[in-house]
Amino acid sequence: MQGNLPPEAQEKLEQLQDLQEKAQNVATQKQQAEQQLSEAETALDALGDIEESTTMYREVGELLVETEYDNAHDDLDEKVSDLEVRVETLQKQEDRVQEQFESLQEELQDMLGGAGGAMGGGPGA
C-alpha cells in the first residue's frame, strides 16, 4: 500500500509510525515510573510504622548498608517527589505525542481524500 501513496502521504505515514513508536516508548516509561512510585510510596508508608530507633539498611548496589531512620525517610521522600514529577512529565509528553499523532492522522486522511486511505477505514480504501 505504501508504494501507491504520493510522496507527501508516504512521508506523513512514516511520521505517524514514528509517533506511534514514540508513544509506546513514553507509555512504557510512564508505566515503569508509576510502578516505582507505587513501590516507593508503599515503602514510605511502611517506614511510618517503624520505630525510629530500629536499625535500618538500604541497598547500595549488591550491598546492604546501615543507615539512620531520618536518612532513609528523607531519601524515600525525595524519591517519591522525584518520581511524581517524572510521572507528571511523562503524562504531558504522552498527551503531546497523542495530539501530534491525531493531527498528523487527520492531515494524512485529508491528503488521501478523507476516505481513510492508508488507515484502512473508509469505503474508498
UniProtKB/Swiss-Prot annotation:
It comes from the Archaea. HAMAP family: PfdB (MF_00307). Heterohexamer of two alpha and four beta subunits. SUPFAM superfamilies: Prefoldin. Molecular chaperone capable of stabilizing a range of proteins. Seems to fulfill an ATP-independent, HSP70-like function in archaeal de novo protein folding. It holds the Pfam family Prefoldin_2. GO terms for biological process: protein folding. The gene is pfdB. This is Prefoldin subunit beta. InterPro entries: PFD_beta-like, PfdB, Prefoldin. PANTHER family: PREFOLDIN SUBUNIT 1, PREFOLDIN SUBUNIT 1-RELATED. It comes from Halobacterium salinarum (strain ATCC 700922 / JCM 11081 / NRC-1). The keyword 4Fe-4S does not apply. The keyword Cytoplasm applies.
